[in-house]
């Protein structure tokens, strides 16, 4: 499954990762890579919780987001 993850760096230098299609699924890390690892774990836990409660799992995505400099 693939989910869109938004990563932003806050004013303290921490990287905040969140999954818009999974409300409340947010994690952070001191580095971008750490934030990615942490959000992967958070998504796994989130999906497991949905399954345990019999809630539907949001559909995965098949798209790519790119940054373009102008």
Q: What is the predicted role of each segment?
A:
Residues 7-22:
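Short aromatic-glycine-(Arg/Gly/Cys) micro-motifs in beta-strand/loop hairpins
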Residues 23-32:
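A short, exposed loop/beta-hairpin motif centered on an aromatic-Gly-Thr core
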Residues 1-4, 37-70:
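Short, charged, surface-exposed hinge/linker loops at domain edges
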């Amino acid at each position: 499954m693939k989910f869109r993850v938004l990563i932003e760096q806050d004013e303290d230098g921490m990287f905040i990762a969140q999954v818009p299609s999974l409300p409340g699924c947010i994690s952070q890390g001191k580095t971008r890579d750490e934030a990615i690892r942490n959000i992967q774990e958070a998504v796994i836990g989130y999906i497991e919780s949905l399954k345990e409660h019999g809630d539907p799992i949001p559909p995965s995505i098949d798209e790519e987001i790119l940054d373009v400099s102008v």
